[in-house]
């Protein structure tokens, strides 16, 4: 139903091969690009923070988040998904790069390197986007970016911005 998520799924398949799981609703890869699991869902969720964009790809890592941090992390972004039973954290964004940025923020909060504050989270997402817009590749120590998702020369992102339903959105948050 949602062409954008279908296109991104094809982009992932080009770089990582056929998905490990495939249904009419989603494609799933296990243990790729530094993530425990990557799920591309047939959805297109408008998310207004820190600027309008659409979410449809989920990335997960193993990370034990203390329960007393959950509420504060949830206030930072609706894109942060915590599963205390699995000791797993997910991010739902519009690209692997945005998900890696989101997960890195959670890792930094859990490790005590930063506070769980919405302004800090948004600063990181906007910083990632600014680097991309300036032709700089975004990098994280733990994330290998095997698909070149964070490369500003990536053909998938050549359009940069899209307009849907009257809303100008950045493609790839």
Model-derived features with residue positions:
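Non-cytosolic coordination micro-motifs
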Residues: 1-26, 31-37, 43-173
């Amino acid at each position: 139903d949602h062409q954008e998520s279908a296109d991104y799924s094809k982009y992932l398949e080009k770089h990582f091969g056929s998905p490990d799981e495939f249904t009419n609703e989603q494609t799933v890869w296990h243990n790729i690009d530094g993530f425990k699991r990557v799920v591309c869902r047939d959805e297109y969720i408008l998310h207004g923070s820190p600027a309008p964009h659409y979410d449809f790809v989920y990335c997960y890592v193993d990370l034990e988040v203390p329960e007393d941090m959950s509420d504060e992390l949830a206030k930072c972004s609706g894109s942060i998904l915590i599963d205390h039973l699995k000791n797993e954290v997910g991010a739902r964004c519009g690209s692997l790069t945005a998900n890696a940025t989101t997960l890195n923020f959670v890792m930094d909060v859990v490790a005590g390197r930063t506070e769980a504050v919405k302004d800090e989270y948004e600063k990181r997402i906007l910083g990632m986007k600014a680097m991309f817009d300036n032709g700089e590749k975004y990098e994280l120590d733990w994330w290998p970016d095997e698909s070149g998702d964070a490369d500003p020369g990536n053909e998938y992102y050549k359009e940069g911005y899209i307009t849907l339903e009257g809303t100008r959105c950045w493609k790839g948050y």
